[in-house]
Amino acid sequence: YENSPLEKVIKQHNPGRVWRENGRSLKIDEYVNIAGNDTLGCFGFQLINGAREALNISVSKQYENGSLLVTRSEDEDGVTLFEFKDRLERTVLERRIESRLKGDKQLSDTYYIYDDLGKLCAVLPPALSDQLSVGNIPAEKLDMYGYLYKYDVAGNLMAKKLPGISWEYYVYNVNNNLIFSQNGEERKRGEWKFSIPDAFGRVCLQGVCKVAIDPFDNPYLKPIFSGLSNWYVCQYVGSTEYGGYQFSGSLMAGLVGPKPLVQVINYYDNYDFMYRTDLSARDEFRYTHEEGFAATSSSAKGMLTGIAKLHTDAYDQYRNGEYGVDSPYNYSVMYYDDRGRLSQTVSDNHLGGMDRDFFSYDFNGNALRHLHRQTGAGNEILSDSYTYEYDHAERLVKALHRLGDAQEVILIDNVYDDLGRLSRKTFHNGLLNTSYSYNIRSWLTGITGSSFEQVLHYTDGTGIPYYNGNISSMVWKSGEDDIMRGYHFTYDNLNRLTNAVYGEGSVLVQNQNRFNEQVTGYDKM
């Protein structure tokens, strides 16, 4: 600990004798920024939120001495991160030292820029940070390299620009529910994705529409200031063409072109939709009790009770102007027990038949049994069932499967060690066994099976030892081949892989360099 009443941690030794013997630990130091210093200096920025997508960012002089807290953290292999925080504890800079060439440090800086309300408005990656100088940052550079964000009056993310793609827009209602979104490709087609909630914020309708919306002048937020009671949601009334839902107020007032393409319809709280949709004459969607499985509750308040999904070819019809509101849906109905757990689902399938699933649980809610029964158009019934077993810590130890009337098969049989780690897995009645080994830090060190064997080395083996979790070398053999094959790995100062050198034999010195991989460089995004 630090030699002060604050008792801050300055060094941390994690488990492992080899780390202790080699003096490998995590180190934490704290400094303040120093203007003009190549390691502890940090640029300041001025941000002006312009009209629409415009973001004007200029580089001002560096922060005054002592105005930022700098935390230097170093892992067990000396890889270092400097994190600069302002007085509001916001991270304004993350600095990594990539290399030192001829006495000059090659820095990898990521700057974070906030507005007056503390919202993150821009992230400048190292590719852009390397080009910074005092003055305005050219708009074309921000457009090419910057991660840019703009917010509406309610503080919701309204527009986002990532490198290499167009702006993405987001539109919210007065409850801060996302109701419309659009990416660059959708903008070319004049389309918006919509996700309309009910009064409780639960998504009821999802799909695509062509509607005239300006995300920078969001009409759906105006009730916040005008005192109107229109929340711009949808409500189930049971008699409209949108799966029984009705849009509130002027939610689709800016609609242009065809009617909205509703791709997903969600129903909640009850099963009234079954009597007012295509399901009204289909008794096969009704609840059917199955002995040994959970019974349904008389109330489904607050639960998702039904889903209707439009056939996948409807979107192509919509784009070609051929879509009609009578396009077919596939339905699923969900039933729950008195503890709100899924007890039964009923769905129609692409074969013209039905799928029905039954579930049962233990006291803690772990699934014990699952029965799946499918019928095709010819009323042929296929069924398969699953049974699950758990240990005292509620870890899955066995999963069994039965297809029709065939003999039950043990799909998986898991064994755990005293630390709760998976140590052995057996498949299909013991036909295939796989064992796993770990080091003191629970890093995977070996996989041993009947057809494959692999060993991972971190601090041991024949390669350069790494103590921070990077793999130093690995060897493997497969099938009946007794030849051990493997790679030695090396990394740069940012923990990025630079070389993978191939070899064979127990120490990888035979047939070297046959399948080497060399990374000559990384971008700085």
Range-by-range predicted roles:
Residues 1-490, 496-524:
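Beta-strand elements of repeat-based all-beta scaffolds
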